[in-house]
Amino acid sequence: MTERTLVLIKPDGVQRLLVGEIISRIERKGLAIAALELRNVTEELASQHYAEHEGKPFFGSLLEFITSAPVVAAIVEGPRAIAAFRQLAGGTDPVEKATPGTIRGDFGLETQFNLVHGSDSAESAQREIALWFPSA
């Protein structure tokens, strides 16, 4: 069954010129890019995207980071796309939890600056795709 997931290449990934490497890894995994856009993130979009973290101590710095520079937003499709991309991304903490061979394990240094976001469930993917690609 084909799934769709939202993938974000965060400001650190864009600024470090890792977009091509990350997209290549997604495609080599057998996933397809259905939509792709480089965009600036408004505080409103960031707040909606990260609504589950509102009230947590890191919420303000998370919004500041994601709105600090452009991100690449993509709809990625394929069999088990959600789990496949999350495996490809690696653990949230790039140093302690992400294994070598994953995007975060190979390129990440800090939890907040962990290069990519991928939806964590079918429900999240549907909500996030609607936020980032309203006409999709």
From Swiss-Prot:
Write down the chemical reaction(s) this protein catalyses.
a 2'-deoxyribonucleoside 5'-diphosphate + ATP = a 2'-deoxyribonucleoside 5'-triphosphate + ADP; a ribonucleoside 5'-diphosphate + ATP = a ribonucleoside 5'-triphosphate + ADP
Q: Which organism is it from?
A: Mycobacterium ulcerans (strain Agy99)
Q: What is the lineage of its organism?
A: Bacteria, Bacillati, Actinomycetota, Actinomycetes, Mycobacteriales
- Protein keywords: ATP-binding, Cytoplasm, Kinase, Magnesium, Metal-binding, Nucleotide metabolism, Nucleotide-binding, Phosphoprotein, Transferase
Name of the protein in question: Nucleoside diphosphate kinase
Keyword Transferase part of the UniProt annotation: yes
Where along the chain is ATP bound? Answer: K10, F58, R86, T92, R104, N114
Fetch the Gene3D superfamilies from UniProt: Nucleoside diphosphate kinase-like domain
SMART domains associated with the record: NDK
Where is the protein situated, by its record's location annotation? Answer: Cytoplasm
